[in-house]
Amino acid sequence: MSQLNVDLQEIAKFEALAAKWWDQHSEFRPLHQINPLRLNWIDERAGGLAGKKVLDVGCGGGILAESMARRGADVLGIDMGEAPLAVGRLHAQQENVQNIEYRQIPVEELAQEQAGQYDVVTCMEMMEHVPDPASIVKACQTLVKPGGHVFFSTINRNPKSYLFAIIGAEYVLRMLPKGTHDYHKFIRPSEMAHDIRNAGLTLKEMTGLHYNPITKRYWLAPNVDVNYMVHTIKTGV
């Protein structure tokens, strides 16, 4: 591979915050708050996670990866930041979660090693942090078994998403550190659907993830104007 599909500035952002990953009152609070929603959504659409081989791409400190392991999945979490991975390993050890492993490896490289090895692949809150999202989608398609499920989440690119995800979340509500997101890396649902089709995946569902700053409640609904999640399957035998 001539060039890694990695933005070193993006990696550095999350490396610097690694020690706070499991602090539910830190900058990662939103990830902890949305995790039950996304975990249940994935679990239901995958027909249950228990007993399945699962890959979490861009796993960070392991909030989603460890929760899927707790549901009975055999989980591999991969990321390009070593500090978050170290935090994930330590937390799993402290919590005695044994059916989880972490590796520092690009997903494209793992796809060359382990094509068609996973029942479920997840890539959540990561696509908007890489230079080439289409390459990530293709690698995920390669890694999942025929009939398996691939899940993505990202942020739409439009004036509303700029207002909510950057101005609102980073500057007004201060839910996230300033500079967490780059508007130009946000991905329209049409662009995501295009990459999914080109990779050979079948789009099953898109749903929006919504937040009320007054009630501090998250919920899922069809509107995908800002944050959204995607369920795809790999057809064929």
From Swiss-Prot:
GO molecular function, one term: 3-demethylubiquinol 3-O-methyltransferase activity
Catalytic activity: a 3-demethylubiquinol + S-adenosyl-L-methionine = a ubiquinol + S-adenosyl-L-homocysteine + H(+); a 3-(all-trans-polyprenyl)benzene-1,2-diol + S-adenosyl-L-methionine = a 2-methoxy-6-(all-trans-polyprenyl)phenol + S-adenosyl-L-homocysteine + H(+)
Enzyme Commission identifier(s): 2.1.1.222, 2.1.1.64
GO-annotated biological processes: methylation
Binding residues for S-adenosyl-L-methionine: 38, 58, 79, 124
Uppermost EC category: transferase
Pathway(s) the chain acts in: Cofactor biosynthesis; ubiquinone biosynthesis
Purpose of the protein: O-methyltransferase that catalyzes the 2 O-methylation steps in the ubiquinone biosynthetic pathway.
NCBIfam families reported for this sequence: UbiG
Family: Belongs to the methyltransferase superfamily. UbiG/COQ3 family.
Protein name listed in UniProt: Ubiquinone biosynthesis O-methyltransferase
